[in-house]
Amino acid sequence: IYSLGKELYADVPGGLKKIKQMGYTNLELAGYKEGKIGGVDMMEFKKMVDDAGLKITSSHVNPPVREYTKANRSQISEYWKKTADDHAKLGVKYLIQPGQPSTRSTEETAFVCEIFNEAGKIVKAAGIPFGYHNHEMEFAKVNPGSTEAKLGRRVKGDCIYELFLKNTDPSLVFFEMDVYWAVMGQQDPIEWLKKYPNRIKVLHIKDRAILGESGMMNFENIFRQAYANGIKDYFVELEGMPDGRSQ
């Protein structure tokens, strides 16, 4: 529902019914904060979703800090405990972090992986799998002691996304690949799906604006590989709509 922005909250029941009429069946939430979704009580929001004949499958949530440190480690853990408990009441299938923490060096990235594993344990204890959603800068590269992640095929170093995959526990952390942002990170989503078939379990299907208009997204082959991997869940997202066009 991130795609719908303020348009949805102008008339939540009506907006949800329109989503159902379009043929969608499942929702991925966004806008969670202190027991509310976009300012609406979570259970009240769930009732409106149920009444529209839809199901809440996933939710995007971010801890209140972007830079992870030993000093705020416990704060992050407490956030996940509260967030997981709240979402367990909704019966979500996935709880996913869409915001990239600060990862400017190999060491900083390794610490983020530790925190991801801790979050995974907490969320798993509530009966929900914990996942991570990428943008383009996860495909940047870092080095030991570096102070900046750099994007580019000729840049030397370790790919942050690869480090995330290699240094998180598969039983605690899965990945939701945003195929558009992977392409913007100069990557082929299909190659990642082939390399990590058991780690990438959900997809974000997205284009520069309207799906299929840019000509840059190889959706047919992406879906072919995703289905071969056994991926069952994906979410359509729209961003950057031209003026005069509704989300």
Regions picked out by a protein language model, each given a short descriptive name:
Residues 1-93:
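N-terminal pre-domain/capping segments
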Residues 1-3, 8-23, 91, 158-177, ...:
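Histidine-acidic metal/acid-base catalytic patches
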Residues 4-10, 29-41, 63-77, 101-110, ...:
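Acidic-and-aromatic substrate-binding clefts and catalytic sites of carbohydrate-active enzymes
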Residues 26, 69-174:
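Active-site acidic/histidine proton-transfer and metal-coordination neighborhood
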Residues 28, 58-60, 96, 131, ...:
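Conserved beta-strand positions in the central sheet of alpha/beta enzyme cores
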Residues 37-59, 107-108, 112, 116-119, ...:
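Short acidic, glycine/proline-enriched helix-loop-strand junctions
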Residues 41-50, 83-88, 117-121, 188-195, ...:
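Short amphipathic alpha-helices and their capping/turn segments at secondary-structure boundaries
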Residues 45-47, 75-76, 113-114, 148-150, ...:
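Short, hinge-like loop/turn segments at secondary-structure boundaries
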